[in-house]
Amino acid sequence: VAKLKVDRKGIEGAAVTVLEQNDGFGKKLLATGNGKCNLTNVKQDPQEYHSSQEEFPWRVICAFPLPETLKFFTGLGIYTKNRSGGLYPYSEQASAVRDVLYMEARHRKVKLKTRERVTGIRKERKLFHVSTETYTYQAERVILAAGGCASSVTGSGNDGFSLAQSLGHRIVTPLPALVGLKGVGSWFAKWAGVRFEAAVALLENDRQIAYQRGEVQFTDYGI
């Protein structure tokens, strides 16, 4: 995506290098939407995003808005279907999205480096020095896309926060935003994988303070 943006702006001679600590690309992408990869959402409204800085999430969304996102993926051959506001590839396979992104990166001569865990980033004058366990890269711009603490099996963790903090960014302590609920009973295992539409309300002193409608999925331990 970064290379596509650079090419569209007509920046001559710009080169993009991707540093990935895993032995392959897109592990977290493959898990998105339970393996079906929800690319984006049609319900893009400032009120849908919760932040102490109300303008920040919307500013990020506007930098790559829905029409441009759809145009980008359509240009790669990925057409979408709408499921309750979430947009998924027609194949409903996250691997299809990962594969076209990988092929497009190769086509645009992006340098893809695997097994390169970034250990430090520092800026000296106009250049960033990005250190890994084996080499130090230099770049005029750096996009830090290390992921958060969720799903450590994909290789993500606290590295991204530590690197951002080392560059002077203030870190807000991350909190779980999407968690499973463990239930009591052996019958859950029989329903594992079953999905259905449901509504959930949060009450405080018999007063409803939050309401959400969406998809619920049973697992072998709960929902």
Task: Identify the role of each PLM range.
Residues 24, 31, 95-96, 100-223:
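Predominantly flavin-linked oxidoreductase catalytic cores and closely associated redox partners
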Residues 3, 7-10, 74, 106, ...:
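Anion (oxyanion) recognition and catalysis
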Residues 3-34:
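Glycine-rich FAD pyrophosphate-binding loop
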Residues 14-16, 80, 142:
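Hydrophobic anchor at the start of a short beta-strand
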Residues 50, 62, 66-69, 90, ...:
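Generic structural signal for well-ordered, non-membrane alpha-helical segments
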Residues 56-60, 87-92, 146-154:
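Flexible, glycine/proline-enriched loop segments at strand-loop-helix junctions
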Residues 33-84:
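Glycine-rich active-site loop/strand segments that organize a redox cofactor
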Residues 82-92, 177-182:
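Short linear loop/turn motifs
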